Amino acid sequence: MEQHFNTPSEVIDTNMKAGEGKAHLPLGKMILLGIMAGAFIALGGATSSTAAHAIDNVGLARFVAGIIFPVGLMIIVFVGGELFTGNCLIVMDVVGKKVTWFECIRNLIVVYFSNLIGALIIDTLICFSGNLDYTGGLLGAYAIKVAVGKVGISPLKGITSGILCNILVCIAILMAVAATDIVGKVWAIFFPIMAFVVGGFEHCVANMFYIPVGMMAAQNPVYVAKAQEAYGLTAEQIQGLTILHSLNNFIPVTIGNILSSSSAIR
């Protein structure tokens, strides 16, 4: 019988070869691909927020967002891009002695900040495009609410939610490698990524969209007034949307995302 997917051992071997290539990319190409991936994930975040922002039921809103958000990773897989959370799997190559710790850490640092640049580009374009004006500015208020919730997360919740999130992201990437055709890869990516969005788990690169766009929206008095009216946010909570407070999310979530890669080591 013809086999329509790669076996687990073939998946690991293929992914390790890809990881070795990622670690040895020229710096300029690594930065460019990192910017692309950050932008693609941010586009997934922007479109999923647009689809879900006016839905009152939390479960339904997350389900709708979960249907849309996976497009970001799909674009990365098919078009190309270096995504920090996916590149955490390079640790497999370190364990297999294909890549050094220095090469792994260099890649993760460069890709992390390149993802941030890409996400910030989309954040800026979204704010100037008028996208946040949807539903009388409710989308802008929603962006503020989401950002406030994220910067208020506790370190323990950030780490554990980050672990849960990137387990699913790594599974999506490995399942996409297992699939041998485009349709199979689409569905392989879709379900694990939808699961992490519906679960409300924390993804550091996605948060490079959600937190900065909320900070930008908080500079618009119309969005601020709408956020206070619709979501009961206080002026103090909104004023807490600062770069310093964003580290309350980015540091523990990034740690959690990195720790989850250990689940893929054989």
Which residues are covered by each model-predicted region?
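Alpha-helical transmembrane segments and their helix-helix packing motifs
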Residues: 1-266
